[in-house]
Regions:
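Residues on the solvent-exposed faces and adjacent turns
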Residues: 77, 87, 98, 108, ...
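Canonical leucine-rich repeat
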Residues: 61-62, 83, 104, 125, ...
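Consensus "Asn ladder" position of solenoid repeat domains
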Residues: 56, 78, 99, 120, ...
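Short, intrinsically disordered, charge-balanced linker/junction segments flanking boundaries
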Residues: 201-207
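Conserved hydrophobic beta-strand positions in leucine-rich repeat
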Residues: 49-53, 71-75, 92-96, 113-117, ...
Length: 207
């Protein structure tokens, strides 16, 4: 993972890019104090960085691409345009629910297990480099397609209220929950989803 000085540069850029002076919580950000004293929004231990920035009046684009120390980013309920966390191989959790984003790049996030990105304006989402993803929550977007073929570890999938016309559920023996209501699905084969305990596929075009 990148060292503390490099992490500090990433955070200073994040602060500038998203209007840090207008954040609700910004204690000691961009000061010379140790990262451990940058308020409760920053946790940096043993070379691993977690950020808690939900409902903090962030505006603009979050660009943490290449921040190899990042393991968790929670930034729900802000006013953002785009989030780029590509090339963050340790990132395990991203919550950007209800941020208004139209772009999200998680390429190279090989450790990602939990992705919550519902209530945004996403029209595409690339998940080919997220093989360990177990929870995908992406309802209320504008997705016309959703390729989860690389995400064989999925247990919980919520893709409700999008524009999906097909959803390939082949080989999903481990899937426990599926919410896909409010799409344009005409066919949905769940015959191989032997672990499913909760399903809602209403308001589609299924026959």
């Amino acid at each position: 993972p990148c060292g503390e000085e490099e992490v500090r540069r990433f955070l200073e850029k994040l602060y500038q890019d998203t209007g840090g002076d207008n954040w609700r919580f910004q204690e000691n950000w961009c000061t010379d104090k140790p990262l451990s004293e940058w308020g409760s929004s920053v946790k940096y231990e043993d070379g691993k960085l977690s950020l808690i920035l939900g409902e903090n009046n962030l505006h603009g684009k979050i660009d943490l691409s290449g921040c190899t120390a990042l393991v968790s980013l929670r930034c729900a309920k802000n006013s953002l345009t785009e989030i780029d966390v590509s090339g963050c191989p340790l990132l395990e959790e991203l919550d950007c629910t209800n941020c208004g984003i139209s772009g999200l790049d998680v390429s190279g996030c090989y450790s990602l297990r939990r992705l919550l990105c519902g209530y945004n304006s996403l029209t595409e989402l690339g998940l080919s480099s997220c093989p360990y993803l177990t929870e995908l929550n992406v309802p209320y977007n504008g997705l016309g397609t959703l390729d989860i073929s690389s995400c064989m570890a999925l247990t919980d999938l919520n893709c409700a209220e999008n524009r999906l016309e097909k959803l390939d559920m082949a080989g999903r023996e481990g899937l426990r929950m599926l919410f896909c209501y409010g799409n344009r699905l005409s066919v949905l084969d769940l015959s191989k989803c032997s672990s499913l305990t909760l399903v809602n596929c209403g308001a589609n075009e299924l026959t």
